[in-house]
Amino acid sequence: MAAAAAVAKSVEAGGEPGGGGGGAWSTVSRSGRSSYSAGGGVGGGKVGELAEGLAGVEIGGERRLDKYDIPVEVSGEDVPPPADGFEAAGLVEAVLRNVARCGYESPTPVQRYSMPIALAGRDLMACAQTGSGKTAAFCLPVVSGLVAAGGSGIGHRERSSFNRAAAKPRALVLAPTRELAAQINEEAKKFSFQTGLRVVVAYGGTPMYNQLRDLERGADILVATPGRLVDMVERSKVSLEAIKYLVMDEADRMLDMGFEPQIRKIVERMNMPRKSVRQTMLFSATFPPEIQRLASDFLSNYIFITVGRVGSSTDLIMQKVELLSDGEKRGYLLDLLQRQSVGVANSKLQQPLTLVFVETKREADSLRYWLYSKGFPATAIHGDRTQQERESALRSFKTGLTPIMVATDVASRGLDVPNVAHVINYDLPKSIEDYVHRIGRTGRAGKAGSATAFFTESDHSLAKGLLELMTEAKQDVPDWLVQYAERPYYGGSSYGGRNRRSGGGGNRFAGRDFRQGSGGGYSGGGGGGGYSGGGGGGGYSGGGGGYSGGGRGGGYSRGGRGGYSGGGGGGGGDPYRASAPPPRYYPSYPMGTADINASGWD
């Protein structure tokens, strides 16, 4: 890459010409990563201010992005062709140097298609697999565009009434959770290093004072959660009138979490430029039709891209599903972790990072302490922990100090921990989409990973979706899962996810541009593909909707193994009640189930 020589030169010099000197990039030999540390020469000016927020941020090394040779569908009018590389995309030189510093050698498909569209000033809706590089796909063109436009220097700001400082960011990135906002903030800082741009993050769950101090120094790029941003705008600490770029990441998650009123208030009633003036980009792993229709209120003549099958899981993840009772989960988890530890000890490698998902906050804390008592250092992250506790838990997990993290769904989307080797669904989620996002914490950016799910009788509604996903990803499917998938389920649809607002049928993952008669677009695998000028909508259409019905008509109960017990709730009996699941046999555990349940951790 042409920027590589410039990077080497600037690293040796400990700074860049015109950048104020100061910090330096260094390579850590054990991990192959680079990190920035603020040197003694950082005393002020643009780089001095910027370096304060960047000190200690770790930059990922080579990410094996060439493995992303997956199909891409594009629909819309006058679609720019995909870029073969970062330089071909048209990024400015300062951003190219930062791309090289991060060790990115070639763009992923979502980056290859999104960057030319964004740099051309077009509105964009992008659907891509978890871990496919969505964050860089919008951060890179936004930073490049702001640098090319010049303007405010470090942190655009103005004085409002009563001499209070009001930040006037030129780019706004909305994210559903604190963790995702913090991650995007880190990425944006890496890509805007020594460009003169100032990046600020604002989210709830933590005192506002420090965030207000950051904003008073100005912000070119503001990354925020909707609730905290509304609060800051109403306090006259932020003005949205200068917004040139609006990005919504995990847009479906924000709407499902109930942020629609805040988002509409931000976009429509807080003095933000009209959609014909600003540029708007929406990124997510799923876009059901009703969310596409809602999002279209914020977009103008947009281009829709789908990278891979929306809602699918990457084939870099080896998936296993184990049939268990609730009482067997802890014993099987312990056995799984012990076998994993033995393999690591024999190979003298570092303990792999393992993410364990549970349903409740109470179970997260309980399981964490229980694992510690069994000799497995673990931490936990969930909504009841303070922001400081959550950040400390993530830091401890990322560094490997506690290589096991027990989490609720607060950590299931958007978080980028580069080296998660194993995701364990101790409790399965309620929808296939959430399952996909959970296991997407591993197998990221071209790296292989493993995912294990503990399936109980209460997870019957997920059987068909799991079967389809595992079959599509060419995984080994156990016979008992096929049997479960073939039985009708009378508890309502499991394929639309939670809180879906449309009735019946439709696409399971809805990765298709709902606009009719869209113009032609590009279609290809990974690197490019040919141009098709048809009128179709692009994207993929999944299967039909799931089963619907009355209340649950009973469930299986564990006596020995299997056996059907007709339960309360309307809906009638299961016509397949005679087909009990086949018996399973488990390895012997250091501690029996009875001992586990008697240990006081349940």
Curated annotation (Swiss-Prot):
Catalytic activities: ATP + H2O = ADP + phosphate + H(+)
Motif interval(s): DEAD box: 249-252
Domain Helicase C-terminal: start-end pairs: 328-485
Domain of life according to the entry: Eukaryota
Residue positions of motif Q motif: 84-112
This protein's UniProt keywords: ATP-binding, Helicase, Hydrolase, Nucleotide-binding, RNA-binding
Region Disordered, residue ranges: 9-31, 492-521, 552-602
Name of the featured protein: DEAD-box ATP-dependent RNA helicase 52A
